[in-house]
Design a protein with these regions (language model features):
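Accessory cap/linker subdomain of secreted extracellular hydrolases
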Residues: 13-43
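Short beta-strand/loop motif that positions the catalytic acidic residue
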Residues: 66-67, 73-75
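Short, conserved loop/helix-junction motifs that constitute active-site signature segments
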Residues: 64-68, 91-94
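Hydrophobic, aromatic-rich cap/lid helix
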Residues: 32-60, 67
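Catalytic active-site module of serine/aspartate enzymes centered on a nucleophile-bearing elbow/loop
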Residues: 94-138
Length: 138
């Protein structure tokens, strides 16, 4: 599974909450009258606050340590995707690989990153799918 972890940046602690309260939340409420900004606030506070407020927002370090799924991390260092979080994920996940960084700063690097992603996905294709493709090729 290729990943670019979205996580906490200590020098910008309210970044994700504030961005979503300004952008995503009002747009969601406009499309869904059954959802209020108070509900959005509760959701975002749960997502970006508390125990998750120092790592990847959607999982814990213990989850990553125990994750047996192969992952390919493509580090970045933009506000919502801190380099430190990406590299900690690589160190914690037992079946993690890391791509090169920076990988999207110049157009000539993007094809290399895409090649790395494709190679990773081919190497970790589920067995049943690989057998089907091999049988189809014969």
């Amino acid at each position: 599974m290729p990943a670019q972890p979205s996580g906490y940046r200590p020098e910008m602690p309210g970044l994700s909450y504030n961005n979503n309260m300004k952008g995503w939340g009002p747009e969601l409420c406009a499309r869904r009258p059954d959802i209020t900004m108070a509900m959005v606030d509760t959701f975002l506070t749960n997502m970006y606050g508390g125990a998750r407020a120092d790592f990847v927002y959607t999982v814990t370090r213990d989850f990553v340590r125990n994750c047996q799924t192969p992952i390919l991390v493509l580090p970045d260092d933009v506000p919502g995707h801190p380099y430190a979080v990406a590299m900690e994920t690589v160190h914690l996940a037992p079946n993690a690989q890391v791509s090169f960084y920076p990988w999207k700063d110049t157009p000539d690097k993007i094809p290399l990153a895409v090649r790395h992603i494709r190679t990773f996905l081919r190497a970790h294709r589920p067995v049943a799918a690989a057998r089907s493709m091999a049988a189809a090729a014969q």
